[in-house]
Amino acid sequence: MKLTCMMFVAVLFLTASVFITADDSRNGIENLPRMRRHEMKNPKASKLNKRQCRVEGEICGMLFEAQCCDGWCFFVCM
């Protein structure tokens, strides 16, 4: 019974999320987040937004604004 209720709630949640994120047929990009909408208008913008990343061997962490280019940080970029 509990599993059935959990499955029912999960299906309702997924259905609601599909309707919330679905495109509007008149304005296809109206419901998308701001960053994604900008990337759809200018596809090269997503490539240009990869700024200020630290290369391998540079110091990284919570105090530094820029993240590692590869995404792996353990006090230094790996």
From Swiss-Prot:
Its main location: secreted. GO terms for cellular component: extracellular region. Transmembrane segments: none annotated. Pfam families: Conotoxin (PF02950). It is found in: Secreted. Residues 1-22 form the signal peptide. Expressed by the venom duct. One of its GO terms (molecular function) is ion channel inhibitor activity. It comes from the Eukaryota. The keyword Disulfide bond applies. Residues 23-51 form a propeptide. The presence of a 'disulfide through disulfide knot' structurally defines this protein as a knottin. Belongs to the conotoxin O1 superfamily. This is Conotoxin 1. It comes from Conus imperialis.
